[in-house]
């Protein structure tokens, strides 16, 4: 699944399309995780103004052309800016072609652009497993974005934030008489917590696995048993790992590419993810694998011991 570094890299790779006008929108398979809106062709004659990322979502901001053909948010025709919310799902990617390109089997949408110099470009949404989504932000933004936690590379994601979240903010538990409610520390596995989008966004399996390894924390350690000092180290490694992954273009484990067709290289630096049965890079112990919430979690039994309080 494309995770935060892959989505961030995709955002950056869309820069050549900024300022270009949409000339055509073709939807070949609308049935993704949620159906593609049937009025996406309304974007024809709009200009792609900017691209943002929130968690693993891309937000494509389009502005309409004024009557004089100049992009503007002030429209005599009462046209308003539009925003697309794009999620790449398990296997999706946005791929840019600088010429008319034949539709491939898993191309579900092709958006055509023209630049000020008459250069024509196509943007293909490619998704073999069809778990992604392309939606209007104004219709689905509240539902999909409002519950999200802080960005891991922002100042809001700190050791203090994560530690207090774990210690004080477990789901409320009702007593048998349903009258009183008490809160307890989070006892779920620390890996599960840092992968929850409500806690912090975008820390997927690859980057959670690598961060926990570098922090010396067993992935199954109950979150409330992780010390504050360990949380400080973990948060620092999450930030460092994600920054490094973005710099290397993310991870290409199957067929992920960004819009310009480039693949990521972070997978070449992996210490433990996907390496069960191999030697630990640090101590040469055999790396082991457990399942947490249905996901593989590779770790070193010597470098990442379970410590019971």
Swiss-Prot record:
Keywords: DNA damage, DNA repair, DNA-binding, Glycosidase, Hydrolase, Lyase, Metal-binding, Multifunctional enzyme, Zinc, Zinc-finger. One of its GO terms (biological process) is base-excision repair. The active site is at 2 (schiff-base intermediate with dna), 3 (proton donor), 56 (proton donor), 295 (proton donor). SMART domains: Fapy_DNA_glyco, H2TH. SUPFAM superfamilies: Glucocorticoid receptor-like (DNA-binding domain) (SSF57716), N-terminal domain of MutM-like DNA repair proteins (SSF81624), S13-like H2TH domain (SSF46946). Its EC number is 3.2.2.23, 4.2.99.18. Pfam families: Fapy_DNA_glyco, H2TH, zf-FPG_IleRS. It catalyses: Hydrolysis of DNA containing ring-opened 7-methylguanine residues, releasing 2,6-diamino-4-hydroxy-5-(N-methyl)formamidopyrimidine; 2'-deoxyribonucleotide-(2'-deoxyribose 5'-phosphate)-2'-deoxyribonucleotide-DNA = a 3'-end 2'-deoxyribonucleotide-(2,3-dehydro-2,3-deoxyribose 5'-phosphate)-DNA + a 5'-end 5'-phospho-2'-deoxyribonucleoside-DNA + H(+). InterPro entries: DNA_glyclase/AP_lyase_DNA-bd (IPR015886), Formamido-pyr_DNA_Glyclase (IPR020629), FPG_cat (IPR012319), MutM-like_N-ter (IPR035937), Ribosomal_uS13-like_H2TH (IPR010979), Znf_DNA_glyclase/AP_lyase (IPR000214), Znf_FPG/IleRS (IPR010663). A zinc finger (FPG-type) spans 271-305. Its cofactor is Zn(2+). Belongs to the FPG family. Monomer. PANTHER family: FORMAMIDOPYRIMIDINE-DNA GLYCOSYLASE. Involved in base excision repair of DNA damaged by oxidation or by mutagenic agents. Acts as a DNA glycosylase that recognizes and removes damaged bases. Has a preference for oxidized purines, such as 7,8-dihydro-8-oxoguanine (8-oxoG). Has AP (apurinic/apyrimidinic) lyase activity and introduces nicks in the DNA strand. Cleaves the DNA backbone by beta-delta elimination to generate a single-strand break at the site of the removed base with both 3'- and 5'-phosphates. This is Formamidopyrimidine-DNA glycosylase. It comes from Psychrobacter arcticus (strain DSM 17307 / VKM B-2377 / 273-4). The gene is mutM.
